[in-house]
């Protein structure tokens, strides 16, 4: 093969029209992602872009909107238990799961119903 896959450039999740402020509250204020500017040509589409380290997450407007309840991104996290407690203190429902050998993990839903996984590999 003459080509190679190098990395995932970004993750895109959908949200309903007009939900940008709610996305900012969840992804920036609660999870700690920084909002990054969308290119001017894409701003009129709505949504918002966020970044944490090398992870870029795009929230795109989709009408009609249907949340991703099964398909999901999985974020590898340091200090997973601290994140879990942080989310619980903010009223976010944490769904425990121990079915991945070698890792601790849990799931949450964003304000729009999209499933998110957070995991930490055990050493």
Regions found by a protein language model. Name each.
Residues 58-60, 116-117:
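Conserved beta-strand in the GNAT
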Residues 1-6, 90-123:
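Vicinal oxygen chelate
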Residues 1-24, 71-73:
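N-terminal beta-strand motif that seeds the catalytic metal site of vicinal oxygen chelate
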Residues 69-87:
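Mid-chain, well-packed structural core segment of small domains
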Residues 13-56:
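Core segments of cupin and vicinal oxygen chelate
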Residues 42-46, 67-69, 100-104:
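Short acidic/glycine-enriched loop/turn segments that link adjacent beta-strands
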């Amino acid at each position: 093969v003459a080509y190679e896959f190098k990395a995932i450039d970004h993750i895109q999740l959908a949200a309903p029209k007009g939900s940008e402020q709610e996305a900012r509250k969840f992804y920036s204020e609660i999870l700690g992602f920084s909002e990054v500017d969308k290119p001017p040509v894409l701003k009129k589409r709505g949504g918002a872009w966020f970044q944490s380290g090398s992870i870029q997450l795009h929230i795109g407007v989709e009408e009609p909107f249907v949340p991703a309840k099964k398909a999901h991104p999985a974020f590898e996290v340091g200090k997973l238990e601290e994140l879990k407690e942080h989310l619980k203190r903010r009223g976010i429902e944490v769904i425990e799961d121990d079915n991945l050998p070698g890792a601790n993990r849990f799931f949450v839903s964003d304000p729009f119903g999209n499933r998110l996984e957070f995991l930490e590999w055990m050493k």
